[in-house]
Structure formats: C-alpha cells, structure tokens
Amino acid sequence: MTSSHPTDRSERRGVPRWLRVLIPAVLILGWLAAAGIGGPTFGKLSTVVSNDQTSFLPATAESTEVQALLPEFLGADELPAIVVVAADAELDASALEGVDALQQAIAELDGVVETSPVVPSDDGQAAQIVALLDASGPSSDLTGVVEELRAEVTDADLGEGVQAAVTGPAGFTADIAAAFEGIDGILLLVALGAVFIILVLVYRSPLLPLLVLFTSVAALCLAILIVFTLAQADILTLSGQTQGILFILVVGAATDYALLYTARFREALGQTQSRWQATLAALRGSTEPIVASGGTVIAGLLCLLLSDLVSNQQLGPVAAIGIATSILAGLTLLPALLLAFGRVAFWPVAPTPARPRTKPEDKGVWGAVARLVDRRSRAVWIVTALVLGAGALGVTQLQANGVPSSDFVVGESEARDGQALLSAHYPGGSGSPTQVVVPEADQDAVAEALADAEGVEGVAVASEDSPSGSIPLPVDPASPFAAAAPTVVDGQVLLQATLVAAPDSDEAQQVVRELRDVVHGASADGIVGGPTATAIDTNDASQRDRALIIPIVLVVISLILMLLLRSIAAALLLLATTVLSYGTALGVGALILTALGIPAMDPSVPLFAFVFLVALGVDYNIFLMTRVREEVGRIGHRRGVLRGLRVTGGVITSAGVVLAATFAALGVIPVLFLLQLAIIVALGVLIDTTLVRSLLVPALALEIGPNTWWPSKLGRGPR
C-alpha cells in the first residue's frame, strides 16, 4: 500500500526524533541569550551617538581642517551657546540688572568654560551673552549643560514683556539631541504596534504575530549588540539618524522575511502532517529568495562606503549588519519557533493536508488580478507605466539643496526662536562667526579683504590676552584691546568674520562661498570654516555622493539580478521598473512635502531613499521572480508568470505594507530628515508592492514572453 505522504515515511528513516527536538531548542535558546545580552544595550546606544556635522565631513574638507585647529586657538574644544534677551521696547535698568545677574549665574555653571560680557544691541532692545561650553565629552554632557543653562534663563528675573532664549551652535545641538530622545522608546513602540496590528489582520491568529514580532525584536537586539560593540571600539561612528534607520530597517526587513517563510511553511503544512518535513520544505522554498533579496539590499547599502561623508559611510555597514541579523533570524529563529509550535501557531484555523489554509488559486483578489493581467497585459502595463510616469513628473518640484540648521527640528525649537530674536537686533552671524585660519604674515591682508567683502559685519582675531577672547580689527589704539596680541599657533592666526545674515541662511552660504575666493586670493594657505562653511561642505559632499553612488548601486544590483535569475533581460526589466517606482515616489513625495510647507531637503534624502527603495524594491521583485522562475520551469512561461503572481500576491503585498508602516513610523521623531525619508520610502514601498510588482512586472513579462529569460534556456521554452 502506498502512503499518501511519502515525506512522512522518509522522515522516520531520516533525522532521529531527539535531534529534531534538540536543533530548534538550541536555536531558540541561542537567540534568547542574544536578545538577553543585546536588549540592555538599547539604553546604552545613545552614549556612542554623535550628531556633530563636522565629525562626519571628510578630513580634506576646509571646515574639518579649521575645526581641528580651533582648540589650539581657543584653548579647549568649545561650542558657543548664545543667550539672547529682547523686548519690544528699550530694556530698562531693572532688566539690564537681571541680565548682568544671569551672566554671573551662567559663568558659575559646570561645563561653562567662559562667558562674554553682556553685549547690548544698538537699538537698546536686546542683550546677548555668549557662553563657551565644554564640548570635549559625549554629546549628552553638552546637552545637559544647555538644559541647565536654559533653566537659569527661565528662572532669571528679567521683568515683564522680556523674552529670552538659548540659541547658537550649542542650542541647536541640544534641540536636535532632544528630538532624538524618543528614538529608542516611542519610535520602537509605534513601529512594533503598527506591525502587530497588520500581522493580526493578515494572519487572523493571536499567536503567530507574536512569534513574528519576537523574531524581529531578537534580530534587532543582536544588531544593536554588534553595532554598539563596534561603535564603542571606534570602528563605527553612529548618528541619531543612523540609529533610527537601523531600528526601522531591522523590524521591517525581519518581518518581511518572516512573512515569506511563514507563507511557505503554511503551504507545506497543507501537504504533510509532519512539522519537520514542512520546515525542510519551507526552508528549501524560502532560503534562496530571502538570502538573495537580503544580499541585494546589503550590496546596495555597502555602496554607501564610497561616500565622502562619514555619516553616509557608516550607515552602509550599520544597516547591512541589521539586514544580516534579519536574514539570520528569519531562517533560524522563526523556523525553530514554528517547528516547536507547529499548527498551534496558526490557531484558530490551522492548515492540514485535509484542510489546507489556502483558497483555490483562481479565487480571491489575486486570482482576479492574475485574470486581468492575463487578458489585458498590454493595456495593464501601458496604463500603469503612464500613471507612474505622471507621478514622477513631481520631481521637478524637488528642492534637495540643503536645509537650514534652524529647520532640522520639526515643531518647537528654542534655538530657532532665539536665532530669530538675535537676527532682529544683531547681525545674524553674531556668536557663530565664520572662522578663517591664515599664516600670521597674511593677517592684515586677509582681514582687510574680509572687512571689505559684502555681507560681512565685522572682523576680529582670536586672542588669549583679550577678555572677550578676540580683538576687533582694525585695532583702535585708544581701545582696551590695543595692548592685546593675537594668538599665534604654528605661525597661524584665527580670524573671525561675523556675517550680516543668519549663519544657516542661503544668503550666508553665498557670502561664505565668496569669502573663500577672497581668502584664497589674499593667502594661498588660508582655509575657511565655521558653521556656515560646515553646512556648505556637507551639502557639496552629499551632492557628489548622489552623483557617484546612484550609478554604482544600479550596476551592482544589475549584476546580482543577472546572476540570480540567470537572465540579462529579466534583470534589466526588474531594475527599470524599480527605478521608475523610485522616480514616482520621489515625485509624489516632493509634491506632498511642498504642500506641507517643507519642500527643502537635505541632498542625502534622495540618495538614502534611492538606496532603500531600489534595493528593497528589487527585494520584492526577487520574491516574485524566483517563484515565477520556479513555476515557469514546470508549467511554461505564461502559466508560470500568472501562478507566481497568484501565490505570492498576498504575502508580498503584506510585506510591503509592513515595511511601509515601519518606515512611516520614522515620522514620529521630530527631525525633518527622518520625516521626509519616511514619507518618500513609505510611498515608494507601497507603489512598488501594489502597482509595480502586482501589475507592471507580470504584464511586461507576458508581453515580452519567454524572451524575458534571455539568454537562459527558459527563454527558449513555450509561451
């Protein structure tokens, strides 16, 4: 008598029962240990995070060179905080007494290296104090000093109708750090909550979503443990935005891989009573697409190592570590959990050979989609391509040339409010001068050229002998600064040019670009730095990165697809449709951001969106086309394409919704970069999994026919 389940009989002759129990037990215990060790590092990760722009610039950038020299001129690694006090009318004697008392209180705070005298404005309606803060320690220490400084300002007795705020580079740094505070709390809660709701709707089971979420969290714990260890050893540099992207990427990717494996496991349970054989079948069916898709994402991410910006360079390996742990968890922990729980995981409706947990393939939504693509393939791909192309036209509204530092934080920002007060009563660059290092012999020539330049309010030279730390130039013989001498370090002096415009404005950037020409003309060895120059160098490096890395990512992913699918035509088809999807997401995203009043974006936003959308978009196409290729080899091209679409439709769309939801969760962090990235990537993933993967790719594959697989032997098969 022949058994209806030969795999069950072969199981009895194969791996012994004790080993089938031991393997999942060891895997589960191993992951529990990794999660137990990695979990506590969540709270420690912020201690190795840096959000200082200058630390991410290439060493050859002028602003980086100047930043490295500043401690030698100023005596310490310091960052200025500017306390500005203003009123609608002239400050009275009582208010000025309060400002003097505030200056004395600030000078006594731990972490405050030095304070300037109170500097009243020309209109008499404002006063400012520059406090130099110790920036040699972790960023959290600096943030703590700013918080104490703000507490002193809040408690100061300045009188009625007087406004006060802490701004300047230290103020903006503290505001950005505060914006990132929720990154390991509310961000994870929102992302995991959204994923859990989606999984409950997909599986209609209370237990299976918990197993999938545990897999994702375990993968994240291991990734954080590895990244924290490398950052502690100064092998990696971590920023707040990289930390947020790591969290979201691991949760989304690990859940996606879990969805793919679970679909194969459920399908196998409908064909055999044996959980062990179902596990082996699911691993055979899911390992190749999961490893291939994850490997493609890793390859795309590692292209960021070619970036000039250290922040971009480090995102590549950090995110690649996250994808690697997601693959590992999806192919070890989840199979072990599902093997242990078996059909109970799918309760209340568990698949069995007598009652498979699947509908007939020609029924339901994906049966209808497959019939539409089958009957109207040409119309489907033409209409879909036109819709996507129309959306891509929104790219003309894209403004990816940089964002003022005052706009980095979405919502309330005391530093931004303080900068507005400062600009209303003082030159906009007060407290945040452009720093120019020149040979001592060129001091007078460069200082004169700077003073004559348009957009410069005044020029000073750094001096340890001066009570204010600098000497205004040219020196007035009758002034108290006349006896002070400039600080000379290795034959160089530090000039400080105060700009008329706010240091993060477009006007200031234009002035500093012109000042660099002025300085280089007056001194061959002169270099220009400071906050505005740092922003210029960062934006310029980001634009160079975009022009270099995008083509390289396309070439790398093309080669991977050709090797995986053994087809040049299929690889180019998938890549072209994914790039079209990216263009649509970028265009529609630009229109949405313009409507929201935040059209300007950092140049790295389109680059990051490209890497994620192209790599992840190809990810979903790999899920589809590996199954299609498998089916084409068995039942021919046309039937294989349609069956691949039907059987993968639900799982891939669910995976896309999960990833879109996790990236959308980045929007809860009030940082403009992350909000814009969240909108564009979430849009792109939804577009890719609903329109591109479900309609455009299958319809084009039917239109092209077996030539889709050229030059492999599948290209010579029947239609």
Describe these PLM feature segments:
Residues L32, F56, A87-E90, V365:
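N-terminal extramembrane/targeting module of integral membrane proteins
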Residues T54, P353-R357, S405-D407:
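Charged, low-complexity surface segments at secondary-structure and domain boundaries
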Residues S50, L57-A81, D88-T173, Q399-A600, ...:
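Structured non-transmembrane domains adjacent to transmembrane bundles in polytopic membrane proteins
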Residues M1-V49, V112, G137-A400, S523, ...:
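Membrane-embedded transmembrane helical bundles of large multi-pass transporters/channels
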